[in-house]
């Protein structure tokens, strides 16, 4: 390819017969580490479950600005948040602890970094057993921080 040329590819939705993306619809965040779906329970606990029928895994992602998202449970109405010690929890109201930087990685998974703690590179992560991984224990390259947004 010569410098300045643009190459276009056919839409993947045609090749794989996928529905066009609708970001208004709830998503499931599937974690590469252990095969868990991110879940926000009514008591504010955040963990992972392999039960795809669990209503608490349906999450609404909404953009605050380019690359910045809020992640809200459609069932409980709580927002995913990360406190000052790096613990994930469900918050009733959106705050700066609820804002995450969403990044599409080369392997097509997404990562979510706490915007408030961006200088520390604290990611949303799940351990193999489905429990939350604290922000300070996460780092780039771990499977625990890789999430695949799936349709409900």
Swiss-Prot record:
SUPFAM superfamilies: Cytokine (SSF50353). In the nucleus, phosphorylated by PKC/PRKCD. Heparin binds at residue 33. It comes from the Eukaryota. Coiled coil: none annotated. CDD domains: beta-trefoil_FGF1. Residues 2-15 form a propeptide. The modification N-acetylalanine is found at residue 2. Residues 127-143 are annotated as: Heparin-binding. One of its GO terms (molecular function) is S100 protein binding. Monomer. Homodimer. Interacts with FGFR1, FGFR2, FGFR3 and FGFR4. Affinity between fibroblast growth factors (FGFs) and their receptors is increased by heparan sulfate glycosaminoglycans that function as coreceptors. Found in a complex with FGFBP1, FGF1 and FGF2. Interacts with FGFBP1. Part of a Cu(2+)-dependent multiprotein aggregate containing FGF1, S100A13 and SYT1. Interacts with SYT1. Interacts with S100A13. Interacts with LRRC59. Interacts with CSNKA, CSNKB and FIBP. While binding with LRRC59, CSNKA and FIBP seem mutually exclusive, CSNKB and FIBP may cooperatively interact with FGF1. Plays an important role in the regulation of cell survival, cell division, angiogenesis, cell differentiation and cell migration. Functions as a potent mitogen in vitro. Acts as a ligand for FGFR1 and integrins. Binds to FGFR1 in the presence of heparin leading to FGFR1 dimerization and activation via sequential autophosphorylation on tyrosine residues which act as docking sites for interacting proteins, leading to the activation of several signaling cascades. Binds to integrin ITGAV:ITGB3. This is Fibroblast growth factor 1.
């Amino acid at each position: 390819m010569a410098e300045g040329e643009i190459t276009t590819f056919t839409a993947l939705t045609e090749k794989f017969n996928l529905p066009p993306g609708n970001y208004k619809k709830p998503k499931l965040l599937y974690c590469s580490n252990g095969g868990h779906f991110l879940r926000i329970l009514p008591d504010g606990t955040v963990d992972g479950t392999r039960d795809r029928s669990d209503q608490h895994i349906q999450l609404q992602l909404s953009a605050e600005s380019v690359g910045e998202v809020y992640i809200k449970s459609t069932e409980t109405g709580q927002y995913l948040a990360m406190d000052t010690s790096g613990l994930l929890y469900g918050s009733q109201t959106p705050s700066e602890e609820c804002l995450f930087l969403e990044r599409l990685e080369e392997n097509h998974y997404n990562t979510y970094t706490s915007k408030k703690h961006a200088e520390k590179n604290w990611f949303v992560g799940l351990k193999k057993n489905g429990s939350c991984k604290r922000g300070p224990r996460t780092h780039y390259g771990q499977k625990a921080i890789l999430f695949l947004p799936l349709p409900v």
